[in-house]
């Protein structure tokens, strides 16, 4: 949790599937910059399972508990502060489920590199992994069922499935203002399939923002590269890498802040760090 002394809004952050357990570490630079700009940042960790509906409910409960604690401890006022959702990859899907299923009030959602693939594509060898996890249990069950000529469906999918997720968003998603960010070098991004679904509800409030970078750009940190006493070819490569990665990350940060506050006024602030519970 990052709390500036005079917060202007709250940002609830949810990360990707395999880094969502430690968002404060994986996304440290980006989240810290949001805190410096005056935003309370609540980064909610989660363990990935096939039941995305349950994860969405859990992270929402955790977020609401943290906000209540901050208000109780007077770290933030109990008055109105707008709340924004910020998600990366699977975190986007979770925010979309929260906005579709649980009637939350949000000033808007920022969805970075949205991913809604089925198990087989979202997780390398996902189908085989799921099969192996249940093989021992199913082996005995299948033997028993065979004598009754019953069959067992060994296909596994997220809950809700990609198709069910799209239907939920189309029919029940209640957050009208959205920023969709897609990176130029991201082969698993599905922002373009999400965009028309959201446009059906409030096209004038859906902002599409293509940016240079790849699926891992939000995880980047500013690279500190010190050259030696003599400038070498390795130093040249290091400086180029630092410049390229830093520019993509800083551009992402700038677009997020511009959308959050179009007036371009971002107050500098010291932030207090506290672990989320």
Predicted feature residues:
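Short, surface-exposed "cap/lid" segments of acyl-processing enzymes
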Residues: 1-48
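C-terminal catalytic-base region of ester-bond hydrolases, centering on the histidine
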Residues: 135, 139-142, 156-277
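Alpha/beta-hydrolase active-site loop
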Residues: 50-79
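Phosphate/oxyanion-binding active-site loops and adjacent basic polyanion-contact surfaces
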Residues: 22-26, 51-59, 248
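Short, surface-exposed basic-aromatic patches at helix termini and helix-loop junctions that form
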Residues: 31-37, 61, 100-105, 198-200
């Amino acid at each position: 949790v990052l709390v500036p002394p005079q917060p202007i809004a709250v940002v609830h952050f949810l990360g990707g599937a395999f880094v969502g357990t430690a968002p404060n570490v994986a996304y440290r630079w980006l989240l810290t910059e949001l805190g410096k700009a005056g935003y309370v940042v609540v980064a909610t960790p989660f363990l990935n399972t096939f039941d995305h509906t349950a994860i969405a409910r859990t992270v929402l409960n955790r977020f609401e508990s943290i906000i209540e604690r901050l208000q109780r401890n007077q770290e933030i006022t109990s008055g109105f502060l707008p709340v924004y959702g910020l998600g990366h990859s699977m975190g986007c899907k979770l925010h979309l489920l929260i906005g579709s299923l649980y009637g939350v009030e949000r000033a808007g959602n920022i969805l970075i590199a949205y991913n809604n693939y089925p198990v087989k594509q979202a997780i390398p060898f996902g189908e085989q992994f799921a099969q192996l996890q249940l093989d021992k249990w199913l082996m005995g069950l299948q033997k028993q069922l065979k004598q009754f000529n019953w069959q067992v469906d060994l296909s596994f999918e997220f809950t809700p499935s990609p198709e069910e997720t799209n239907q939920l968003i189309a029919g029940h998603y209640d957050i009208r203002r959205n920023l969709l960010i897609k990176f130029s070098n991201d082969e698993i991004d599905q922002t373009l399939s999400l965009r028309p679904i959201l446009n059906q509800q409030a096209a004038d409030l859906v902002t599409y923002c293509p940016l240079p970078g790849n699926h891992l750009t939000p995880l980047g940190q500013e690279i500190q590269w010190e050259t030696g006493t003599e400038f070498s070819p390795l130093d040249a490569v290091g400086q180029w890498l630092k410049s390229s990665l830093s520019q993509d990350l800083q551009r992402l940060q700038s677009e997020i802040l511009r959308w959050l506050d179009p007036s371009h006024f971002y107050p500098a602030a010291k932030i207090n760090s506290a672990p989320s519970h």
